[in-house]
Amino acid sequence: MQVSVETTQGLERRLTISVPAEQIEKAVTDSLKNEAKRARIPGFRPGKVPVSVINKRYGKAIRQDITGEVMQRNFIEAIIAEKLNPAGAPTFVAGDTDTENFNFVATFEIYPEVELTGLDAITVEQPTSEVTDADVDTMIETLRKQHATFEAVERESVVGDKAKINFVGSIDGEEFEGGKAEDFELELGSGRMIPGFESGVEGHKAGEEFDIEVTFPEDYHAENLKGKVANFVITLNEVLAANLPEVNDEFAKLFGVTDGGLEALKAEIRKNMGRELEQALKANVKEQVLNGLLEQNNIELPKPLIDGEVEVLRKQAMQRFGDQAANMPELPADLFTEQAERRVKVGLLLGEVIKTNELKAEDDRVQSLIASMASAYEDPSEVVAYYNGNEEMLQNMRNVALEEQAVEALLKTAKLTEKAVNFEEFMNKATQQG
């Protein structure tokens, strides 16, 4: 086998490979003979079909299969010999074949050589926070609202009430699509509607009809409504006031806490909030580290890796639509390209961090991650057993652990400062960004 390597552009490589033609001819002949022994063709006894008949019927397909196998086998031998690391499947083009040699060209992209730079220039502002009694009380209030019951009242509506309304919206006297509803239930103060709508409903009683004027935000999702001033004619059908449950041991039972009452519920809430805070703090630091790593290291990315990541993201996006996905057109690749490029780049850079630091997933860390994740379920031990009994799930957790270790390795050389943050503000921001 003779091999020549050519760098065409960037990460693309072209191998021109020449192998003895007899490799193909012998394999084709052997395959034709074997097929002749197996073939059942009318007019011939089993095992007695002439090779010439088999060649006439199946020769072209057999030769194509053999040629493909020869190209694949010799390509693998060539990249091993030339120490090349393909980032995707090659494209084969069969060349001229003379009496002695079969020539073909394999074109593919390789992984880039990654040399990490600027690791000591990465800056990280590490947030610190804790769950306070006030934070637990705020969560208790949220849970009370989630378990509220509502009853009709004969008074003016206020924030926290639910208002059942009919409304008709118009712009310059013309109704617009989506601007009309009947018996629409709106929680005042929820922020579901555009600015000014909910506050315009406040202070009115059931049975009243009134107009409000609001302006659609400039970033509103409907292009034809952005920045437009609209008038809404509203009929308030019913005002429903919230009845919040009392915070006591009976309240705790609503959440399955039967032993320890209210104090046990608060302890469980604090534990869950603490776990979520820890995860959010780690995610924040990780994001800063990765952003710094990307800023300091610019590498060329193989297109096959980007294309593969686009398909993963596209599939995940379609799954979120559930049963509706079957009737949807394929989402364009452009929607995912930027995110795919980032993920590929992060993967390559972290791979080099792992290689440079000779990192291996720590078993204790893997089990700790599984236990932390399982603690959010009703039966944590069952979840832990499931993960440890499923090699694919276990490998995913090893990858998470290894990524954590790589981030920690980068933190050792990064410029690190601490900043105390308010729990509620930090978690709200983390939720919006997530």
UniProtKB/Swiss-Prot annotation:
Transmembrane segments: none annotated. It is an enzyme of class 5 (isomerase). Its EC number is 5.2.1.8. One of its GO terms (molecular function) is ribosome binding. PROSITE patterns: FKBP_PPIASE. It is found in: Cytoplasm. The keyword Lipoprotein does not apply. Belongs to the FKBP-type PPIase family. Tig subfamily. Consists of 3 domains; the N-terminus binds the ribosome, the middle domain has PPIase activity, while the C-terminus has intrinsic chaperone activity on its own. HAMAP family: Trigger_factor_Tig. This is Trigger factor.
